[in-house]
């Protein structure tokens, strides 16, 4: 995981931190910096290096790398004045606010809790009642499959207090969709709506699968889906592909021209049929998704 931010007007370059996810762990990210404190470079610790020692980056024991001036720059700008060991990248360069927790961190939480039920203890954090941060990565209760990740891309907080299919906004057909903006005012009061993983404005999504047991030419698969992940079909695009499939090719329809042979337009059409009668129609879509995928 690498998080970075430009230095802004009057300065060149950017500051950053990168951490390697342990092999038995999973992580998540949703438009909000998640790297907080991290181990600093020292003579005794060979697992961490700064950008001054990038020549060591391929050493297998290295798990943390950071810009040598990531803390120095924060001090110069007045963003941080504590001890180096207390420096948090997220709290300094991308501090959490309400939307950062409820619209971003909540998506990571929903993914984590699918694979570690103990993550339910962070519900109070997601509800903005407490301020403890979630771990950057977790050990899942079992090994994840491609299907697990496809399901995660279709998440609307089902089974949680944030479940999009519940409440007045869901209407008579338990819709998991809410129109933008997420935050709005009505009669002088401010309201908000949840931001799930799957949304109607998604252009495309994918799951990258790397299979070391398969021939190199076909070992990599990009399970690629166009439009809303809730109603799309994830298609395997192999690393040995030599031409783009007709259904995904530029020129087969456009943003203004419908095409019955365009994967985007077909997925979009199915989704638009489902939205008004979600609880009636989506179960049928889900059955077909399972068979086709």
What residues fall within each predicted segment?
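C-terminus-biased signal that marks the final domain/tail of proteins
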Residues: 7-293
């Amino acid at each position: 995981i690498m998080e970075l931010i430009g230095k802004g007007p009057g300065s060149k370059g950017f500051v950053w931190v990168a951490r390697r996810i342990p092999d038995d762990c999973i992580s998540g990210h949703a438009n909000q910096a998640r790297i907080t404190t991290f181990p600093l470079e020292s003579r005794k610790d060979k697992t961490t290096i700064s950008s001054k020692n990038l020549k060591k980056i391929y050493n297998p024991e290295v798990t943390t790398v950071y810009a040598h001036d990531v803390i120095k720059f924060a001090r110069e700008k007045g963003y941080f004045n504590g001890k180096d060991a207390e420096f948090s990248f997220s709290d300094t360069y991308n501090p959490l606010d309400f939307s950062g927790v409820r619209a971003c961190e909540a998506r990571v939480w929903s993914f984590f809790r699918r694979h570690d039920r103990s993550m339910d203890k962070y519900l109070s954090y997601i509800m903005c009642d407490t301020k403890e941060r979630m771990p950057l990565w977790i050990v899942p209760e079992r090994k994840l499959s491609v299907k697990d990740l496809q399901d995660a891309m279709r998440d609307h907080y089902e089974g949680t207090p944030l479940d999009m299919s519940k409440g007045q906004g869901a209407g008579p057909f338990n819709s998991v969709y809410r129109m933008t903006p997420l935050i709005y005012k009505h009669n002088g009061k401010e309201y908000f709506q949840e931001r799930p993983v799957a949304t109607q404005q998604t252009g495309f999504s994918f799951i990258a699968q790397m299979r070391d047991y398969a021939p190199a030419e076909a070992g990599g698969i990009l399970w690629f889906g166009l439009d809303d992940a809730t109603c799309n079909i994830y298609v395997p695009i192999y690393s040995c592909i030599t031409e783009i499939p007709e259904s995904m090719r530029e020129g087969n329809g456009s943003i203004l021209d419908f095409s019955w042979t365009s994967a985007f337009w077909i997925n979009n059409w199915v989704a638009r049929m489902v939205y008004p009668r979600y609880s009636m129609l989506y179960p049928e879509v889900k059955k077909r998704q399972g068979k086709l995928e």
